[in-house]
Amino acid sequence: MRTKSFRPLAALVAAVVSLFGGAAQAQEEEKVLNIYNWSDYIGEDVIARFEKETGIKVRYDLFDNNEIVHAKLVAGKTGYDIVVPSSNWAKLQIDGGLLQKLDKSKLPNLRNVDPAIQAQLAKMDPGNQFLVNWMWGFTTVGINVDKVRAALGGPLPDNVWDLVFKPEFISKLRSCGVSFLDSSSEIVPAVLHYLGRPAYSKNPGDYAAAASTLKSIRPFVTLFSSSGYINDMANGSICLAVGWSGDINIARQRAIDGKTGQNIQALIPKNGGLLFFDTMVIPADAQRPGNAHKFINFLLRPEIAAANTNKVFYPNPVPESRKHIRPDVANNPTVFLAPAELARMVAPDSLNNDMRRLMTRTFTSFKTGL
């Protein structure tokens, strides 16, 4: 009887030992971290510093649009431990159960993040449970100043979006090269905003208006690119790009460093560009979430955040990093926007899958010329 009475207790003890033993094993992750991030979006020695400090080997793959990232996450088994989607796409991924919640006890440097950035992310991620900002910026127009002025034969329009969405302007620029981002979620909201419609409209009729405008300018777009346009601007192969603010500044810096003679400038639209907040997330099936938390926490150190901004000309979410940022970057008005200009920017919004599909069809028709 006594032996029999102890069997349940023995089983319970074995279960507890197994549970805690399994937890200990889970914490002993392989010294590897797989990251999937945007191209041209990290400081030169940031990965090397993390690897040296932690002994974790980073495998770092690149993408150039949110559509690719989302498709991979939906398919599952990406093999990645950190992915960097924009916040409005991450909202879809949260809703779809594709991400795992952050363990904030492993992220003490979250205290360094600007509350205003956290508030922006909370619009997509209530309670800031899944997303941490990597960096942010805005979608705008970048130009080769000398070539554009020569092609126009006069001054720039007051509304810089006229350069790309009015045939009378863009038709004059075709000869020196016009590039658009190869992404429905960038170009369609931009033209909707230009037309005075909600950039992330839920009204199908607005997309018909966008399609009409895009069709009128299609003959004058010579390139669709979400990464290669940086070098194309720097070497003078194109004179205008609808692109991201930091990328256009990278092109400017490469032109300076390479002494190519190209005068590249990111423009700040008076009626606003499209803000984006790129976020670090951990896929639901990530194999090394502990290593992922270590990297996220590392990125939120002021000196590390500054190293990223100094290299790629995008603002980071850590205010204390400003003292580590080079003066030429800190004083660049297209990197750190003036409050009035920031107020005119359009904040990101989420769309359901039906509206996403309509946006994709609108862009595909534009790109193919159909």
Residues covered by each model-derived region:
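A ligand-binding cleft/hinge motif common to bilobed small-molecule-binding domains
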Residues: 89-92, 240-261
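A bilobed periplasmic-binding-protein/Venus flytrap-type ligand-binding module shared by bacterial periplasmic
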Residues: 142-147, 193-196, 276-288, 307
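Conserved C-terminal helix/tail region of periplasmic/extracytoplasmic solute-binding proteins
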Residues: 231, 339-370
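Mature extracytoplasmic/periplasmic domains
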Residues: 283-344
